[in-house]
A protein has these predicted regions:
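Gly/Pro/Ser/Thr-rich low-complexity, intrinsically disordered segments predominantly at protein N-termini
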Residues: 1-196
């Protein structure tokens, strides 16, 4: 992940701040953090996840998938603003820069974000009372981590691989891991003979 200048700011300042570029930022510990651009593989996995969710929630229901809108978190007085790859909310979607009451949060793990997503964002997302599930979908290898709130407690499942499914309590059905990786080839790229 590309780092922004270490300029501390409040959440209110961050929400109106413009650095004059097309760079997207998250706010962590009062410091804006630039988000690395997504790869083609990352984008395809994100779209596949959205399709898998849409198949379960339908197009006419009260819940909607929101792509790359912000989530506001306040943890021990520290305001944070994350931009997950996908979130599902059953509230009206407004012009606000953030999502109200997400039920499901999806992060696609990239080489530069894996540790932050798993070590920081997952525990932070789990503090939101509305969130029932968090999915981490790896773009580096076919591996999915699912976290679910069950009877008020968070349960993390063993890492899931292709040909496995998991029961999504929020979506009310099984989700195949293969659905996230449709069209993705993880075989090593052939060696470039011209690079010798």
């Amino acid at each position: 992940m590309v780092e922004a200048a270490e300029r501390r700011m409040t959440l209110a300042e961050f929400l109106v701040w413009d650095d004059g570029t097309e760079t997207r930022y998250e706010l962590v510990g009062g410091v804006p953090r630039a988000m690395a651009p997504a790869s083609g593989r990352h984008g395809l996995i994100q779209q596949n996840a959205a399709n898998a969710i849409q198949d379960k929630i339908g197009r006419q229901g009260p819940c909607r998938i929101v792509h790359q809108a912000g989530l506001l978190l306040s943890i021990q007085g520290d305001d944070r603003f994350y931009v997950p790859d996908l979130a599902v909310t059953c509230r009206d979607v407004s012009d606000s820069p953030y999502i109200d009451e997400p039920k499901l949060v999806v992060e696609v793990i990239s080489p530069s974000t894996g540790r932050l997503d798993k070590d920081n964002k997952v525990p932070d997302y789990c503090t939101l009372p509305s969130v029932d599930e968090v999915w981490l979908i790896d773009s580096r290898k076919p591996l999915v981590h699912v976290y679910q709130r069950v009877n008020g407690q968070w349960i993390g499942h063993v890492p899931l691989r292709p040909a496995q499914t998991f029961q999504s309590h929020f979506l009310g059905g099984e989700v195949p891991v293969d659905a996230f990786y449709d069209g993705i080839d993880f075989s090593p790229a052939p060696a470039n003979p011209a690079a010798g």
